[in-house]
UniProtKB/Swiss-Prot annotation:
It comes from Marinobacter nauticus (strain ATCC 700491 / DSM 11845 / VT8) (Marinobacter aquaeolei). Its EC number is 2.5.1.61. Its cofactor is dipyrromethane. Monomer. The gene is hemC. Keywords: Porphyrin biosynthesis, Transferase. InterPro entries: HemC, Porphobilin_deaminase_cofac_BS, Porphobilin_deaminase_N, Porphobilinogen_deaminase_C, Porphobilinogen_deaminase_C_sf. Transmembrane segments: none annotated. This is Porphobilinogen deaminase.
Length: 313
């Protein structure tokens, strides 16, 4: 069989390149007849670093240009952090695999303090996420939360320069880049419920390319797919993007029972709406939609309306 060259569209950040290299290595390990190249692309989210993501329209900021590369034939597939993947895909493209989830937690990183409880009143904490900000403010209303944009190395450099007393970012990204030692501890999900899909990698490609779909299929992790699909169903009903104070985290309690927790928070932390439920794993998406409806009826609709400018329909 002749060799097929697959081209992965990827952002140029260290973390995005790590993720793309990981998928490249897996594809080449699984298939002797495949060579993989990386196509580096700058996205809108990479170009605008001085404005909070939520202000520039948080949906798809890190994927649109990658999708254009697949649609016009420059690339065959793209690797995404699942927490960045929009709910809707352009015609002809789709999410075809979710790899086994790594650490889904948020990490507390500080050069002076071992634990968030040790932060003095008024301490400055950096994060780029409204979800993290809402939960931080709910737990520690005395803290100053400041926007922290940029890639992982940039964020750590800003902490080291003394601009922040602590920063909070995804544990998985730090670990993938070898920064295990920078994590003081991982925030428990009771303190900071993770983002939809956090810690998992997704693969998007042209859905009509059956040969490519067969090559990618072994990378799909069924347990992770079912968990993240339930989380995304909740998020879809709430019209959430990656820059909205929505959290959802699903666990498999046994082979068949899915436990899903969801949260919507006012960014100032004064209101946090929480729901949870269980269902057979095959009904995870239904559970996600039902829990989203519960959140809306509890008052999350008003919180989200302030952010979106309209109530989720």
């Amino acid at each position: 069989m002749s060799k097929r060259t697959l081209r992965i569209a990827t952002r140029s950040s260290a973390l995005a390149l790590w993720q793309a290299e990981f998928i490249k290595a897996e594809l080449e390990r699984l298939h002797d007849n495949v060579d993989v190249e990386l196509i580096k692309i700058k996205t809108q989210g990479d170009k605008i670093l001085d404005v909070p993501l939520a202000k520039i329209g948080g949906k798809g900021l890190f994927v649109k240009e990658l999708e254009e590369a697949m649609l016009d034939g420059r690339a065959d597939l793209a690797v995404h952090s699942m927490k960045d993947v929009p709910m809707e895909f352009p015609e002809g493209l789709g999410l075809v695999a979710i790899c086994e989830r790594e650490d889904p937690t948020d990490a507390f990183v500080s050069n002076q303090y071992e634990h968030i409880d040790q932060l003095p009143e008024g301490a400055v904490v950096g994060t780029a996420s409204l979800r993290r900000e809402a939960q931080l403010r709910a737990n520690r209303p005395d803290l100053q939360i400041k926007v922290l944009r940029g890639n992982v190395n940039t964020r750590l450099a800003k902490l080291d320069a003394g601009e922040y007393d602590a920063i909070v970012l995804a544990s998985s990204g730090l670990k993938r880049l070898g920064f295990h030692d920078r994590i003081r501890y991982c925030l428990p999900d009771t303190f900071s419920l993770p983002a939809v899909g956090q810690g998992a990698l997704g693969i998007e490609c042209r859905v009509g390319d059956t040969e490519l779909l067969e090559l990618i299929d072994p990378l799909n992790h069924t347990d992770t797919w079912d968990r993240v699909s339930a989380e995304r169903a909740l998020n879809r009903r709430l019209e959430g993007g990656c820059q909205v104070p929505i959290a959802a985290y699903a666990l498999l309690e046994d082979d068949n029972t899915l436990w899903l927790r969801g949260l919507v928070g006012a960014v100032d932390g004064t209101q946090i709406f929480r729901v949870e439920g269980r269902a057979p794993r095959a009904e995870g998406e239904r559970l996600g939609r039902e829990l989203a409806e519960q959140l809306l009826s509890m008052g999350a609709d008003k919180v989200l309306a302030e952010i979106y400018g309209h109530t989720p329909r």
